[in-house]
Amino acid sequence: MVPDDLAGLRKLYLGFTSSRVILTANNLGIFDNLKKASSATEIAKKLKIDPRATEILLDALTGIGLVKKGGGRYRNATVSNRYLVKDSHLYQGDIVKHASTMWQNFSALDEVVRRGRPARRGFDHESFIMGMHNLTVLRTESLSKALGLKGVKTMLDLGGGPGTNAIAMAKKGVKSTVFDLPETIKIAQKVARQEGVRGIRFIAGDFHVDSIGSGYDLILLSQIFHAFSAEENIALLRKCKTAINPGGRVVVQEFPINETRTAPPHSALFSVNMLVGTEKGRCYSPREMKRWLTETGFKNIAIKYLPETVLIIGER
């Protein structure tokens, strides 16, 4: 009999096997072709992949609960139809595709820990940005409720990626601006068109060096700080303070991590993701970020916890 602690350890160090099966199935388009029951041979022929390998992959997907098998035919489990099929409004396939990039970067972790420098082995910009859209679309309503948009006429989604938060607020009547790098702004404009939202202002630039505009009632920095050093984040907050109207707010949204930087596990592991993918990034505790807002002159600072993230809110 395997001791419980050893079974737990095995689950941890072999966790990559389930992950790789999901990533490969997503990359190959398996889930999009299993909305209706099909045989392994049919799927292999349609996707031009090896029949034997396809059958083994489908059996593994069945074993981990993402596919159902019966009478020699396979179809998506409910969870796969909901999140891994492109025509679902809850589609998460882009962020799963981005996880394939993370896989490559994490594979360089030995080297990164030895040298202390990131070693990006691959990066798909569009899947990363659209992956952010996959995640953010699930959180926009809870964010708006937590903030309360009364009196907010203008907002800036700084480093806004796909512009998901700005789009959601524009739908509520807020004059919204998205600021990000030029290649990212192109994607955000496409997302806005797909959502049928007009009137959003898009500014392309580098927020570390370029003007971000002014006259905002609210500036949102959602999932920005973890990519940079404390010094860079403080400088960014100073820039935000000059761009916010008197009485306006800055809102930082991040993954929460405790003061010892060890929990929750997702955040501690996400810091490793920043280690392998950025020069100076990691997760920061709410207390650290609150201290930065105090240092840069914001007042009435509040910390609010949402289901997956934490907000640090300060007033000018």
PLM regions: where:
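Alpha-helical subdomain
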Residues: 1-63, 68-69, 149, 162-316
